[in-house]
Amino acid sequence: PLNKFIYKLRWLIVIILVLFGLFKLNASFSIMRSFQYNNNISDIYEKYYVNPKKAQINFPSNKRNLIYIMVESLEATDFSYNQGGFKYKSIIPELEEIANRNTNFSHGYKLGGFYDVLGTGFTAGAIIGHTSGIPLIGGIGNNNYNKYESILKNAYSIGEILADSGYKNYFMMGSDKNFGGRGKYLSLHGNYEIFDFNTAKDLNYIPKDYEIKWWGFEDKKLYQFAKEKLIKISKKDEPFNFTMLTVDTHPIDGYLDETCMVDNSLTQYENVFACGSKMLNEFIAWIEKQKFYDNTTIVIVGDHLNMIKKGIYEDMPQNYNRKIYNAFINLSVNTKCTNNREFNTFDIYPTTLAALGVKIEGERLALGTNLFSCQDTLTEELGLAYLNTELLKKSNYYNNCLFFGKC
């Protein structure tokens, strides 16, 4: 009897562990919700997707350079409460001042930012959302895309638009380009010249055995390498798109550089953001002193909302509406429609082109709307909840046409 009891108890424990594991897996990847919605078909792309390949896009005679800086997990939430954020005192005061001094699109009447929507809440998806105005859907863990021969074969990104208009595209990141299929996407959609962790080793920017137990090399080096590259490419006769992706502020707790000043009233993760704000501010100040600056537009954005609250938003109410940082610097266009906007990652795609002085017939590309135009975004027109619900459903147009190019 005792052996039978132990035998049954073991199986009971196994069943409990399996059920707990399935519960955690579903909580992480929304498997049940995805299964539920994937049995429904959405026509959101048929109704609202504007094919950038067919759109009328006109560049000014004087083509402006673009420096596009994606900061890992940077939120408008990090502003001070008085300026529209959550913090009693801003943990990114320099970036708050940059947003104040330049063009910041806001969800309110103070400083603010934008939503990430389904398929853009992780770095690979965020890059695609920012540059192609569509989400990256599918793949457990959201980073299993290197297995595909191509990624979003029929998408038409800002990199492709710029390359087709005589620009040269560059992408610099401290991490490995192969993670999440980022390198493959950038090569196929804009033929970017990519500088990543492996490039830095191959070209002896860092030692072959360089290791700081992080995602790659640190942002201090990224900004130094970027300065060297910008000086070199600015001497060429072609306009450039130089895009960067930082890594120090990646969760969990970030990478606190040894050169950072530490505020003991802040957590380590808050100190990482505070130090990152100073580093980026210094980099922007350096750009503003360069000869190429007058003909260069700078865009600073967070890639997506922070995936964790530990060490940075632990005292935040569950219903707090977090937004992603944005600042547009040295523009050739003006607008009165910066405040009280409802917008998401997709809208940054046409808005960045407009910031360069590009004219877009209809003011929409893919699922994004040019914010400078004052035209309603899809978030404003349809509502965020409806938009996310439709993006979660199966789309024949997305799967067949956009992803696999069968259209």
Task: Tell me what each language-model feature is.
Residues 1-36:
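Transmembrane and membrane-interface helices of multi-pass
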Residues 3, 41-45, 289, 382:
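A general marker of short, structured functional hotspots
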Residues 30-48:
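Alpha-helical transmembrane signal-anchor/signal-peptide segments
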Residues 52-64, 68-407:
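Solvent-exposed soluble domains appended to multi-pass membrane proteins
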